[in-house]
Amino acid sequence: MFKINIIHQISKKIPTSLWVFFLFAIISLLIQSSEIFEKGFVLGYDSVFHMNRFYDTMMQIKTGNYSYFISLFGFQQSARVINAVYDLGMAYFMGFILLLAGSWLKFQLITSFLVNVIGAFGVYRIAKKCDLNIYLSFLIGCIYMTSTLTMSWNLNGSFNGIGNMVLPYVLYYGIEMMTNKKNKFSIVGLGLSMGILLQTHFFSSLLVTIALSPFIIITFISCKEKLIFVLNLFFSVSLSILSSLNVWLSLFHITKNNIIIQTAPRDLMRNAVFFQ
């Protein structure tokens, strides 16, 4: 009885969010259990492309031979410009995880676990911000974890899953600016989360910008202190640009100085079907 009381007292001191995070971790391990026990790497349609990217950054970290633009180790050492225009920040983070993991199987298990848990917890925070109870919020997080939005990384090696891991943390501040009585939101939170998303998956940052637009417009119309709201938004945008400045400079530099061939030359009209 004494031991039960001690456990009960300890459990009360642990924050609810930590318990939720722990439960998400257990569910993620259950989802990944077949891969853990079978010890088999899941090779998706995008896996080889990203494996080359991360192997390149991993070897750069390991050897100390860094190259911002060209691929020194990946893509058959072809000197292709990939990571500089494809989310360089996350590429180096993934390369670091690969270096620590030591194998592709461990790398996939670790990254899939992080995508599942972090993404689910982000959606849980949004649900709680919308005043849903803890059980419903947890359920929504579980649904998000098992949806194609995050599972696309686990099963297909698609980087959309990585972007969808970060996306809820940006969208959270759209909810915050609408639900707050004075229409206040965390300037640093919105700016840094968007900056991290820009370093993670550029297309996801475009999607979340579109998703945030209605929140911004409605909040601007309804708020009384419009100038303060616009200034706060300006500071957040500035912070997100500064925290992802390398992304913008890379795109500008390559686009401006590329005189040999277009980055991705495609004649879309040649494969189109015309009806007369």
What does each model-found stretch correspond to?
Residues 21-29, 113, 117, 141, ...:
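Alpha-helical transmembrane spans of integral membrane proteins, capturing the lipid-embedded, hydrophobic core
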Residues 166-175, 207-215, 240-243:
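Hydrophobic cores of alpha-helical transmembrane segments in multi-pass inner/ER membrane proteins
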Residues 207-239:
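Perimembrane helix-loop-helix junctions
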Residues 1-34:
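Start-transfer (signal-anchor) and selected internal transmembrane alpha helices
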